[in-house]
């Protein structure tokens, strides 16, 4: 008799994806982030579901309903902070996951990579709309500033913004629709993640060397399941340290003031995980130019396979490319810092230089360096 896990129609899918999946034997801990992202998504969906039971998406009661969750609902505070800080953990894992893909040349799996970029945009949209829901000062003004960027689109811009707002400013209609979208998006993300996995399993995983691992595969379970459990424990430990000891570390104090359309906060800024993109947006004095740079800063990932000029897939044996990769990482950290600073000297020029460096590194320096490395190896 065949094992039920190999014969049952549903179990068979699970078995081929998580148990008997042939996996390269040499994948490092950088390959843990996919499963960690899955955990973050499930955690956020579950906590979000319980928050939605007590939240009201009306401008008059939204802020007080969040206060009610924290003050009156049993364990409401921990659910709320696990949800908010869970989003931060999600983005840490996301950026590590994308960075891994760039370093080891995983973008040569075109379908997997492109679905991944779509996933990144979707998660960013969900996080942005979630930040609006508590209806604090930064929620309101963040929503106003970011949605207003669409007015830079020629001809249709103004109509588009008013259509998204559901009126002539960010108001009741905006909050209600943002709640609706914020509720549905994680399920769309989960569906996309399954497509992402489907495409990945068509080709099998990449590995640190970037060469075919068909000759050396091991079953996913128990080897990588136990490894993923270690990663998950570290993720949960970090999250709970944040939630229980510094729940507001990554938030903005302005969001503890109820939204007031008549009073603008001195420094409007998004959550920390959008600051690098916000810095790129602000570094261009023109509105449309800034919006284009903002979108391109993420959309540029789509071009990664086209910009790959090296004869080797991975950066493991390419020291010059490695240096540039870590310069890019430092550049993104610089811009994350700049995005949280006021628009004044010397932050303006640092932000502009960081933005130029970002595009220059990805579009010019890294492809040229790869060609130089090919020359060194006489390839």
Curated annotation (Swiss-Prot):
Entry-linked SUPFAM superfamilies:
a domain/subunit of cytochrome bc1 complex (Ubiquinol-cytochrome c reductase), Transmembrane di-heme cytochromes
Query: Its Gene Ontology molecular function terms?
Result: metal ion binding; ubiquinol-cytochrome-c reductase activity
Cofactor entry: heme b
Q: Which GO terms describe its biological process?
A: mitochondrial electron transport, ubiquinol to cytochrome c
Kindly give the membrane topology term recorded for this protein.
Multi-pass membrane protein
Say if the entry is tagged with keyword Translocase: no
Asked if the keyword DNA-binding belongs to this entry, the reply reads: no
What Pfam families does UniProt report for this protein, alphabetically?
A: Cytochrom_B_C, Cytochrome_B
Which compartments does it reside in?
Mitochondrion inner membrane
Keywords assigned by UniProt, alphabetized: Electron transport, Heme, Iron, Membrane, Metal-binding, Mitochondrion, Mitochondrion inner membrane, Respiratory chain, Transmembrane, Transmembrane helix, Transport, Ubiquinone
Q: Main site of residence? A: mitochondrion
- Residues bound to a ubiquinone are 201
Which superkingdom, per the lineage?
Eukaryota
Where heme b b562 binds, per the record, is at 83, 182
**GO cellular component assignments:** mitochondrial inner membrane; respiratory chain complex III
Which residues does the record give as heme b b566 binding sites? 97, 196
* Cofactor binding mode and count: Binds 2 heme b groups non-covalently.
What are the transmembrane regions?
33-53, 77-98, 113-133, 178-198, 226-246, 288-308, 320-340, 347-367
- Family recorded in the similarity comment: Belongs to the cytochrome b family.
Quaternary arrangement and interactors, per the entry? The cytochrome bc1 complex contains 11 subunits: 3 respiratory subunits (MT-CYB, CYC1 and UQCRFS1), 2 core proteins (UQCRC1 and UQCRC2) and 6 low-molecular weight proteins (UQCRH/QCR6, UQCRB/QCR7, UQCRQ/QCR8, UQCR10/QCR9, UQCR11/QCR10 and a cleavage product of UQCRFS1). This cytochrome bc1 complex then forms a dimer.
Miscellaneous remark of the record: Heme 1 (or BL or b562) is low-potential and absorbs at about 562 nm, and heme 2 (or BH or b566) is high-potential and absorbs at about 566 nm.
The protein's role, per its UniProt record: Component of the ubiquinol-cytochrome c reductase complex (complex III or cytochrome b-c1 complex) that is part of the mitochondrial respiratory chain. The b-c1 complex mediates electron transfer from ubiquinol to cytochrome c. Contributes to the generation of a proton gradient across the mitochondrial membrane that is then used for ATP synthesis.
PANTHER family listed in its UniProt record: CYTOCHROME B
Protein's UniProt name = Cytochrome b
Upper classification of the source organism reads: Eukaryota, Metazoa, Chordata, Craniata, Vertebrata
